[in-house]
Amino acid sequence: MVRMNVLADALKCINNAEKRGKRQVLLRPCSKVIIKFLTVMMKHGYIGEFEIVEDHRAGKIVVNLTGRLNKCGVISPRFDAPINDIEKWTNNLLPSRQFGYVVLTTSGGIMDHEEARRKHLGGKILGFFF
């Protein structure tokens, strides 16, 4: 079967494993976008460490789960989010102002909405987690 959206598949696997109470989840294939998204999630403590397993094909990622993640998902298509519209997107996607992050891809790399606001960057919305 052909994978249409690798990031969506990976986040759905993480979501399902978290709901089942698993401690680890195996994601394949590996991509740079998935690694950067997981790095943002790890920086905020929603997942534990993750390890990239190179198998001379597409690669795999083993993610350690902490049980803190409620939901994560992809926004498809990747809508444009100028700096002044990021607030509107966070209100639509996140349950409250206190927690959760919207992940954007900007000219400065993949980052959460707070870092993008600090750096005064807009971009395209990849997904969210809380």
UniProtKB/Swiss-Prot annotation:
One GO CC term of this entry?
cytosolic small ribosomal subunit
The record's family statement is: Belongs to the universal ribosomal protein uS8 family.
Q: Which InterPro entries match?
A: Ribosomal_uS8, Ribosomal_uS8_CS, Ribosomal_uS8_sf
GO molecular function terms noted in the UniProt entry: structural constituent of ribosome
Q: What is this protein called?
A: Small ribosomal subunit protein uS8B
Naturally occurring in which organism (per UniProt)? Drosophila melanogaster (Fruit fly)
Could you give a single Gene Ontology term from the biological process aspect? cytoplasmic translation
Keyword list (alphabetical) reads: Ribonucleoprotein, Ribosomal protein
